[in-house]
């Protein structure tokens, strides 16, 4: 949690006092997995904190276990704050199975882009679409991505291509999974950066935290890039929402009123980083108004390309429209994608080393993932 938020809240209060319980810091030298295990043990034993900062947690898993309160009733009961004052797409993205887990103070968007003549003019694609793009552009590569990285990125939002979450079953004996293997097999096992390959890549990653950063990508790759988004099962436009200072209330808390007062204080007295995307509509509009008041005018701040230093300019209406379209299609990462991706990676490592046939590998993946799903259910 932001120490500044806590200090300011504690100064404003006589009734409540917030302190930090750190599960992973310099004093205990725990790994992330060890810290997460300790947190889940506390949640199970009734020794959990009153609030969680969800920034690095498996939010879907916490909702499945029923350990996070829905914040909508808190908003509904409070006359000092209104959920309608926050960006709808962000609120929707942070609502899992009907539970509003948090309203983040700020966020970053992660996505992928490519040249329009290679990936098409519109956002959104499937694994089949990627395979078709590669067939149509045989000289293209995947930036400097390794086989492992590409597999994880493809499956992050498209795992439902092979998983039926309603029935709890999987099917990897499909043409699409075969195409996935064909996509990643030519990739290296270790990264080897090459500016030339980056220029001829089918897709590259893009990270945005304000309305001006997109200028770097236009300057480096040209104005004809399309922010394609993550690969999904249905080909919808999808961009990753990475949250910071996203506080939730633990369902077993004995001080829920105090926890809500802290969350409300943080949202109303938003002291998050100047210039980062805000979940607050008014603050977002202030950012836009500031840009458009000087649209196109050069700024003193710079970024660097192969040709040298380039000055940022205040964002134009077109640049803002592009970014706003991304914001309208943000999603949190599905929880089980990483676990299933790890299973697939382990088995494919052996396959690519020649340890077993494709048919044997698919059978093992099918059995292991089905067991994983059975255990989760």
Please place each PLM-identified region on the residue numbering:
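Extracytoplasmic/periplasmic substrate-binding proteins
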Residues: 182-261, 271, 282
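Long, aromatic- and glycine/proline-rich binding clefts that accommodate carbohydrate-like moieties
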Residues: 277-346, 350
